[in-house]
A protein has these predicted regions:
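N-terminal leader/capping segments at the start of a protein or of a new domain
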Residues: 1-50
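A short hydrophobic beta-strand segment most commonly corresponding to one strand
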Residues: 92-93, 118-127, 133-150
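Conserved short histidine dyad/triad with adjacent acidic residue
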Residues: 25-27, 54-58, 70-89, 122-125, ...
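Short acidic-glycine-tyrosine-enriched beta hairpin
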Residues: 107-123
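Glycine- and acidic-residue-biased ligand/ion/polar-headgroup-sensing regions
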Residues: 89-107
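Short beta-strand His + acidic residue motifs that chelate non-heme Fe in jelly-roll/DSBH
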Residues: 83-85, 103-104, 112, 126-132
Length: 159
């Protein structure tokens, strides 16, 4: 499995009939850091989301998160991916689609996750480390959130 992602996006025709509007292999892959490739499947920039837009929201240029919205992406972490401790202003729903990877927290604690595991990342500083011999593929949905607060201290996005 390379980062070869089929995007299926539904919508409606002018009569309100459900149709498949997009059925393609996503070609807009970007390298976020050496060893980490990502492709956005879909994004939204409002809550509630607009289900009537004609724009291909998977091709919108977006950073890690979308202010007031969501980002659905597939990420490939290759073995030896460059470290990047970071925190986002989002709640991230993560599914390990294939492979395995270690998530490192800011105090050095590591958690090993593997294919089929599910994670909810709630604005914590973390890093992804792939010590294996094969790529790890994560499906990630990022939902914009307020910065995390702990002990009365705001923990803003960084990295």
């Amino acid at each position: 499995m390379a980062l070869n992602v089929r995007r299926l996006i539904t919508g409606h025709d002018k009569n309100g009939k459900a149709i498949v509007k997009i059925d393609e292999i996503a070609a807009h892959v970007r390298e976020g850091r050496p060893g980490a490739l990502a492709v956005n499947i879909w994004t939204t920039n409002t809550n509630p989301a607009n289900n009537s837009t004609e724009e291909d929201a998977g091709k919108v240029n977006v950073g890690t998160t979308m202010p007031n919205g969501t980002v659905f992406r597939m990420i490939e972490f290759k073995p030896g991916v460059t470290p990047r401790m970071h925190r986002t202003d989002s709640i991230d729903y993560i599914v390990v689609m294939k492979g395995e990877i270690d998530m490192e927290l800011d105090d050095g604690v590591e958690v090993h996750i593997k294919e089929g595991d599910l994670m909810v990342q709630r604005g914590t500083i973390h890093n992804w480390i792939n010590r294996g011999k094969a790529s790890c593929f994560l499906a990630v949905i990022l939902v914009h959130a307020d910065s995390a607060v702990a002990g009365g201290k705001v923990l803003p996005a960084h990295g």
